[in-house]
């Protein structure tokens, strides 16, 4: 860059280059910025398509509500159906269902904010594994701790897992670069806000949120132990 060539002192040039590289790595960590197909965008698109199906079948209305029977037919998580009738597939399908436009809008916004960073950090395949494990873990805790007549839908468990994974990843890399330290503070702030909402708002499945959060944190920790860090890629990328 021209600003680098105009520097007279070698140390000043080095500082300018370092700052430019830091900004470049930070901006490269956004959703889909690693090139090719973005899993985060695919997941958002899939959730939106399923939401349209919910509207068409009456499983939900624009502002929520709708037919509980229609939601069950689409795969909502009903503990009684899983534990008694062994409909284990509901633990997976419920992750793609939402109750109203506000529910899906908030979840997809959160997925867009944190999903792209985590996808860059661990890679597409491991991001999918992390997402699914977190969502399924949230469903497991619903089965264990929620009333058997609960009807649970939403991607919140999987998204909380991404939050937990991103927090652990940034914490373990906090001494390596500035963006990891900054990211850690931002993620922890968002986590605190979301946890406050989880335990203060009505009709929110804390079981799905906490189950996903813990599973995401543990899963990415295991990935980092089993992988190697490459300092040339954002956030100490896991291979």
Each model region followed by its residue ranges:
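A detector for small-residue-rich transmembrane helices and their helix-helix packing motifs
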Residues: 2-239
């Amino acid at each position: 860059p021209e600003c680098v060539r105009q520097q007279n002192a070698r140390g000043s040039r080095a500082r300018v280059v370092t700052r430019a590289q830091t900004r470049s790595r930070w901006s490269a960590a956004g959703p889909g910025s690693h090139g090719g197909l973005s899993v985060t965008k695919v997941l958002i698109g899939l959730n939106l398509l399923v939401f349209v199906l919910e509207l068409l079948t009456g499983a939900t209305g624009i502002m929520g509500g709708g037919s509980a029977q229609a939601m069950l037919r689409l795969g909502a998580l009903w503990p009684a159906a899983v534990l008694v009738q062994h409909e284990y597939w509901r633990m997976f399908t419920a992750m793609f269902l939402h109750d109203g436009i506000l529910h899906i809008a908030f979840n997809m916004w959160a997925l867009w904010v944190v999903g792209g960073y985590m996808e860059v950090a661990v890679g597409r395949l491991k991001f999918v594994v992390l997402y699914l494990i977190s969502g399924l873990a949230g469903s497991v805790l619903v089965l264990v701790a929620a009333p058997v007549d609960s009807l649970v839908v939403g991607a919140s468990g999987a998204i909380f897992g991404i939050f937990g994974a991103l927090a652990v990843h940034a914490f373990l890399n906090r001494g390596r670069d500035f963006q990891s330290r900054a990211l850690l503070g931002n993620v922890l702030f968002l986590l605190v806000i979301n946890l406050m909402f989880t335990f203060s708002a009505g009709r929110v499945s804390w079981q799905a949120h906490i189950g996903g959060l813990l599973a995401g944190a543990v899963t990415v920790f295991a990935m980092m132990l089993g992988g190697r860090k490459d300092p040339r890629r954002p956030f100490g990328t896991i291979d």
